[in-house]
């Protein structure tokens, strides 16, 4: 018997030891638009493709990079509606922590709480796993941090990572370009060059998004004008 007959059951392991619905969720991530993150010596940058379904869509209404707290931001590959649900849950968790302890939630703690939510959706009846992987960028007392969270609920800290349909090219490029002493501006240039690998069409401020956080511990999404400036620098 193969794994196929188990593919509709979330809570039953297949004979090969897989939860097939999680495999399908990872397929949804793998067919999503490319996103990446780079941890620099003095900050973190996350970036993503933003391909719109039609030229009639107002690009300003599509935001793939979101704040979770003033010093933590996130981006996804996979299903946008699932991302919205996780963003809402993560923000609520951060607000509860702030109310209870009167200090901002540490990056690791928020990542762990978000991963716990995702893991719970892999062992409950009547639900399905989230069809997204997240890259979470933050800066707290422990310095700059970058985490990736997958549909299974597993999470790891990364120096640089990528996900989505162009993941193999992007990771190969990052492995060649990444250095421990990379500054934030250099990381932004590297992020743009990584997105260019396998990018269909011409890259512009209308079809990519970039978020960054530095030593000021304020996460922000770059404006189209700022992205244009960085694009001009890497030409």
Curated annotation (Swiss-Prot):
Q: Which PANTHER family match?
A: PROTEASOME SUBUNIT ALPHA/BETA
| Alphabetized CDD domains for the sequence | proteasome_alpha_type_2
Cross-referenced NCBIfam families: PRK03996.1 (NF003075)
Query: What does the record note on quaternary structure?
Result: Component of the 20S core complex of the 26S proteasome. The 26S proteasome is composed of a core protease (CP), known as the 20S proteasome, capped at one or both ends by the 19S regulatory particle (RP/PA700). The 20S proteasome core is composed of 28 subunits that are arranged in four stacked rings, resulting in a barrel-shaped structure. The two end rings are each formed by seven alpha subunits, and the two central rings are each formed by seven beta subunits. The catalytic chamber with the active sites is on the inside of the barrel.
Signal peptide (UniProt feature, chain positions): none
**A single cellular component GO annotation:** proteasome core complex, alpha-subunit complex
Q: What protein name does the entry list?
A: Proteasome subunit alpha type-2-B
Transmembrane portions of the chain? none
Q: Which family does the record assign?
A: Belongs to the peptidase T1A family.
UniProt-listed Gene3D superfamilies: Glutamine Phosphoribosylpyrophosphate, subunit 1, domain 1
Q: What is its main location?
A: cytoplasm
Question: What is this protein's gene name?
Answer: PAB2
Q: Which organism is it from?
A: Arabidopsis thaliana (Mouse-ear cress)
Keywords, A to Z, come to: Cytoplasm, Isopeptide bond, Nucleus, Proteasome, Ubl conjugation
Where does it reside? Cytoplasm; Nucleus
Crosslinked positions (Glycyl lysine isopeptide (Lys-Gly) (interchain with G-Cter in ubiquitin)): 64
> What Pfam family is a match, any one?
Proteasome_A_N
Q: Which SMART domains match?
A: Proteasome_A_N (SM00948)
